[in-house]
Amino acid sequence: MTTQITYFATAARGFEEMLKTELEQICQAECKVTQGGVHFTTTQRGAYQALLHSRLASRILLPLVTTKIFSDLDLYATIVGINWAYIFDPRDTFFVDFNGTNREIRNTQFGAMRVKDGVVDYFERKGFTRPTVDKDHADIRIHVYLDRENMVVSLDLSGDALHMRGYREDTGKAPLRETLAAAIVLRSGWQKGTPLVDPMCGSGTLLIEAAQMQAGIAPQLHRKHWGFNAWKGHQQAVWKEVLEQAYLQQNEEIQPLFFGFDLDHRVLAKAKQNAKNAGVAHLIQWQQGDIAALKNPCPEQVGTVICNPPYGERLGTTPALIALYSVFGQRLKQQFSGWNASIFSGEPELLNCLRLRSHRQFKAKNGPLDCLQKNYQISERTAAEQQADELKFEQNAQVAPDFANRLAKNIKKIEKWAKQQGINAYRLYDADLPEYNLAVDRYDDHIVVQEYAAPKNIDEQKARQRLLDAVSATLYVTGVETNKLVLKVRQKQKGTNQYEKLANKGDYFYVTEYGAKLWVNLTDYLDTGLFLDHRLTRKMVGQMAKGKTFLNLFAYTGSATIHAALNGAKSTTTVDMSNTYLNWAEQNLELNNLPLRNNRLFQADCLQWLAECRERFELIFVDPPTFSNSKRMEDSWDVQRDHIKLMTQLKRILTTDGTIVFSNNKRGFKMDFEGLAELGLQAENISHKTLPLDFERNPQIHNCWIIRHIEN
């Protein structure tokens, strides 16, 4: 049993050096680090000890053959040439894990199939029973790693991956692998025998791993099935000694200094059961609670706060997360003065919302996500310093103060005006400060923050941080609830991407505008269903529509139709290509108790419908897209290029004393006055009259024209 063999322990990228240190401590192995794991030389007893005690290894492999292959024939020949009868009985089941490709073997499934064929053919040629493949519960797992022409064939002594400790019956929505959780604990700076607090513990994995470390409980102590159980080289007597020694190493006389908090009582119930399964239920105290009310359970001692809070790729929405991290940072400073903290997150910018300065940080992968773990030393503060810090927090002085001040100033001016106007949907901020390139809109008691696409020369991470700071400041200045703040990234519209669905929440509510009720949806689409900058245009159209036949072309959700109908239009006709938005327009009509018999809706290509129209209208409102190349349109559309073609068709259906209200959002749009004159039409630019107070900083957001027949 003193024979030295070189094994290979796999690990998540970034944990190789930690695994090397761990293996040296567990079995005094000679170790060599490589990407993705550690080669370690030890006895078979040492390998058993590593399997039982390693918290960081994903698998432990016994290399059987290391060779070079150049084709699938080489692969097959190598596998057939291994003495498999010396390794396992053909009556046992097996499975092949194949990793890597080269020019000839381009698919891991193909590689695994050729290995399987080689193993089966070996036994059949030797006159043995044909072994069976079992994907889920194999007795033997064969591991093959291929890197270009270099191949290693190994026996997987682990069986199931070593992160599967067996204590987790159920988890929350976004669990950590146990190996990653152990690495986070080891990197946190936590010292055994000191308190460890997880304020957002979820299913409890961080605390359970730490408690097992403190109690000396081997992570695989209760595992029943191993990859070596059916291996003919397995030494049961040695394994039994290693197992018995592990039981003797447990330390039952330790203080219960582990504390887990979570808002969700159902997740806490799972955490309690997991802790019981892991043998550490008596060491961990669990409590349901909100992070905003977090209190230090051991104020007389110094310990560590460890946490894997939610982040954008996992749970929650950005505004709620910004508020969560901001409050968390404040509670750390208020309640854990003199303690250490270690926070793991998939969004480094969110860690900045803690407003703490880290002294160490580590990169790691959580599945496909690039994550960061930051360690902090929370400075001790006097009562006066804590009070001053709380005042700063209340004033939000540390987060985007210039933006916060401008937003507060705008709110004071605009909300008074909006109340006088009888509207509850309006813009509060529109890129007033160049470093905060975003818009803030109020829709009743909701806030929408729209980030404009940053120029290419702006650092993406810096822009992201400014956005998070601005959202944090908006939450404070407006006082809006986090679940009523919606964040959007708004880019230049191309074609019909304003119609593309972003979500499927179906959260509709209505806003009021000069007596009209209009449905909005802040989450499911790029736009909300209401263009706020056209508010005065809609009001004007409504006033002009009294007693007239009205056509709304490129109608979107029909908001202009609602104003026209409420102001006494003789009839309204609403046309849009999108069935979604036409249904929305119908809902707007129903909301305002406007009957469909006087207010017709047509779902059609607007230009094609116009060409076929034989009716005439006294008032036409047309607000076409700047550009469109929808598959449902016969031709592409460009408002600058094609507006005279549009006017040609509109003139045909316009009564002699009729009016066209023409609007578009193309910056730098130039009206073709000569082309209009040739049609017998004249245009008046009324853009300045249709620009409301909340958009006065952006006079080019739209242009608007009154077009009539030239008087003879």
Swiss-Prot record:
Pfam families documented for this protein: Methyltrans_SAM, RlmL_1st, THUMP, UPF0020
The listed locations are: Cytoplasm
Q: Record's PANTHER family?
A: RIBOSOMAL RNA LARGE SUBUNIT METHYLTRANSFERASE K/L, RIBOSOMAL RNA LARGE SUBUNIT METHYLTRANSFERASE K_L
By its UniProt entry, which CDD domains does this protein fall under?
A: AdoMet_MTases, THUMP_AdoMetMT
Source organism's superkingdom? Bacteria
Predominant cellular place of this UniProt entry's protein? cytoplasm
Reported EC number(s) for this entry are 2.1.1.173, 2.1.1.264
The organism encoding this protein is: Actinobacillus pleuropneumoniae serotype 5b (strain L20)
The coding gene here is: rlmL
Recorded catalytic reaction(s): these are:
guanosine(2445) in 23S rRNA + S-adenosyl-L-methionine = N(2)-methylguanosine(2445) in 23S rRNA + S-adenosyl-L-homocysteine + H(+); guanosine(2069) in 23S rRNA + S-adenosyl-L-methionine = N(2)-methylguanosine(2069) in 23S rRNA + S-adenosyl-L-homocysteine + H(+)
Query: Which EC class is the enzyme in?
Result: transferase
**What GO CC annotations are associated with the protein?**
cytoplasm
Q: Where is the THUMP domain?
A: 46-157
Question: What protein does this entry describe?
Answer: Ribosomal RNA large subunit methyltransferase K/L
Entry annotated with the keyword S-adenosyl-L-methionine: yes
Which function does this protein serve? Specifically methylates the guanine in position 2445 (m2G2445) and the guanine in position 2069 (m7G2069) of 23S rRNA.
Q: Which UniProt keywords apply?
A: Cytoplasm, Methyltransferase, RNA-binding, rRNA processing, S-adenosyl-L-methionine, Transferase
Entry GO MF terms: 23S rRNA (guanine(2445)-N(2))-methyltransferase activity; RNA binding; rRNA (guanine-N7-)-methyltransferase activity
Asked if the record carries the keyword tRNA processing, the reply is no
Q: Which InterPro entries match?
A: 23SrRNA_methyltr_KL, DNA_methylase_N6_adenine_CS, RlmKL-like_Mtase, RlmKL-like_Mtase_CS, RlmL_1st, SAM-dep_methyl-trfase, SAM-dependent_MTases_sf, THUMP_dom
Coiled-coil positions are: none
Give the record's family classification: Belongs to the methyltransferase superfamily. RlmKL family.
